[in-house]
């Protein structure tokens, strides 16, 4: 990382913390996924932690995963995201996922794993080295309090930045349902590349398949993100200025 990128990273973190403070949000980072599950069980009773971050299926005692939650002024959890490290040095992400895509299913859906499939795109075929997988991204916004605030963008990019501080990965990747991707979430939160049609999940009950894209970033993309302006509404700008 160049000195200029370090300075930009510091500015991004400072501006992010001001934005969080302007919305009376406190971020908490943790490594215990039993604790994460307990937090989400209370905050989102209908949500089941996904298999990639399930404490019953994974051992993260080596520091290969962390989670982030945001807590509002009333003590409510209003955001979550989680990241874990995968090392595919000497191979490619495409090869890894060809063998292990069933480790990344959508939660709470009974799947026909015989029919479900992974299709390697050109991005995954080129990607090798240390990978950070990004998942569990959620923001509670039932009353529209955070709409137009830029929070989803900043929270996601803050997770990317934290991954670089923990592991300095060569790439970061995520899977996103088509209906979410088509609403512009990938572009809005900072993902610069996508492989379409990556995963096809077939429910056992005969419903149509769920199709996902694979969004990803190269290491240099993550360094570039702090240079990209974030659009926020006027109220948020005023709040952030007062929090400075």
Language-model features: locations:
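Serine/threonine-rich low-complexity intrinsically disordered regions
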Residues: 5-9, 13, 44, 89, ...
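Acyl-donor binding region in acyl/amide transferases
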Residues: 97-196, 200, 204-208
């Amino acid at each position: 990382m160049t000195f200029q990128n370090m300075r930009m990273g510091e500015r991004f973190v400072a501006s992010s913390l001001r934005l969080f403070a302007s919305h009376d949000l406190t971020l908490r980072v943790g490594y215990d996924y039993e604790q994460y599950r307990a937090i989400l069980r209370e905050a989102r009773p209908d949500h089941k932690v996904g298999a990639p971050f399930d404490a019953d299926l994974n051992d993260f005692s080596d520091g290969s995963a962390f989670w982030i939650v945001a807590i509002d002024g009333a003590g409510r959890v209003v955001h979550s995201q989680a990241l874990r490290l995968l090392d595919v040095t000497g191979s490619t992400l495409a090869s890894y996922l060809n063998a292990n895509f069933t480790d990344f299913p959508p939660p709470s859906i009974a799947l026909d794993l015989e029919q479900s499939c992974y299709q390697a795109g050109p991005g995954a075929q080129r990607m090798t080295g240390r990978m950070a997988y990004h998942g569990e991204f959620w923001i509670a916004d039932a009353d529209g309090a955070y709409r137009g605030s830029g929070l989803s963008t900043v929270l996601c990019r803050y997770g990317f930045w934290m991954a670089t501080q923990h592991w300095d990965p060569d790439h970061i990747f995520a899977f996103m349902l088509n209906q979410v991707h088509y609403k512009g979430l990938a572009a809005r939160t900072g993902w610069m590349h996508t492989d379409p049609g990556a995963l096809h999940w077939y429910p056992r009950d005969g419903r149509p398949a769920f199709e996902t894209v694979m969004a990803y970033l190269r290491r240099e993309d993550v360094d570039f993100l702090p240079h990209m302006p974030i659009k926020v509404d006027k109220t948020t700008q005023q709040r952030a200025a007062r929090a400075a």
